[in-house]
């Protein structure tokens, strides 16, 4: 049956991309690294829920910007040494300082140790002693799991970045604003290095889901976002555009123009990614690194 399909309908099917072995290796590592990120988020959320049930001082001590930092090296080291509020009350400033150094902190150790000591030794709601002790055992088990997950993530991140650095396209990809070794590895993993895979930039944009869909009937036209897309590219593109807006004046101006025109944040970000992908396709085809002046060239002012 498969042979007959190829004989009669070969024109209706696309051939698999002819990516190099190097690109396929980067794809394996980049996707494994992304799965490790999701594993860390899942275990971190489990830890946060458990800590919130009996150890509120830990939530306050390791509160970050927008989320808790219980998965940080310092938090994991200190919570392993003091898995319950009872253990935390016995910690001294000197002991906390030693734990911070053990976790890798080098600056502001004394100041941070005093801050943590004030929070962890302050009065807080407590569970009954047997329940608190049982939850402490549970906490240690989750921390051991989180240590393994964080170790795997660090190892896969280093491997993905190292594999990407040896690829010939790495120089062009990382020349774009907002693209570091990890984001570059994720982009290469999904786009590949087969130059014949995408006939033009429009094909790449449609594959990534950044190109809008226009439905027209008579005098009416509806422009909507594309739902069929490669979510891996979208995830990498989100981080790319967030960073590009901060470090590229041209990208910032493009985003601001779309926002001023009435686009939502996600729509303006998608528009920017659509434009950046088009430029990435062109630069990969030519092998020439990114040029900010050419990428976001402004039209000359009209003559008076």
Locations of regions flagged by a protein language model:
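A detector of single, family-specific signature residues
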Residues: 1-304
């Amino acid at each position: 049956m498969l042979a007959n399909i190829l004989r009669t309908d070969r024109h209706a099917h696309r051939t698999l991309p002819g990516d190099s072995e190097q690109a396929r290796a980067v794809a394996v590592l980049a996707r494994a690294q992304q799965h490790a990120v999701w594993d860390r988020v899942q275990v971190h959320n489990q830890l946060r829920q458990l800590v919130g049930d009996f150890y509120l001082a830990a939530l306050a001590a390791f509160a970050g910007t927008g989320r808790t930092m219980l998965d940080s090296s310092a938090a994991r080291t200190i919570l392993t040494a003091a898995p319950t509020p009872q253990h935390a009350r016995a910690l001294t400033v000197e002991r906390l300082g030693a734990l911070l150094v053990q976790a890798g902190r080098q600056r502001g150790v004394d100041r941070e140790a005093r801050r943590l000591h004030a929070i962890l030794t302050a009065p807080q709601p407590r569970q009954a002693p047997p329940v608190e002790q049982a939850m402490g055992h549970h906490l240690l088990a989750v921390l051991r799991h989180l240590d393994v997950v964080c170790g795997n993530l660090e190892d896969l991140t280093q491997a993905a970045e190292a594999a990407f650095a040896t690829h010939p396209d790495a120089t062009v990809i990382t020349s774009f604003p907002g693209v570091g070794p990890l984001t570059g590895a994720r982009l290469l993993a999904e786009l590949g290095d087969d130059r014949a895979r995408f006939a033009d930039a429009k094909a790449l944009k449609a594959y990534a889901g950044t190109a809008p869909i226009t439905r027209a009937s008579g005098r009416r036209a509806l422009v909507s976002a594309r739902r069929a897309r490669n979510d891996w590219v979208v995830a990498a593109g989100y981080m790319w555009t967030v960073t590009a807006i901060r470090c590229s004046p041209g990208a910032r101006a493009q985003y601001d123009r779309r926002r001023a025109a009435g686009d939502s944040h996600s729509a303006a970000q998608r528009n920017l990614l659509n434009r950046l992908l088009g430029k990435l396709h062109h630069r990969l085809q030519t092998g020439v690194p990114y040029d900010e002046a050419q990428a976001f060239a402004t039209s000359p002012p009209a003559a008076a």
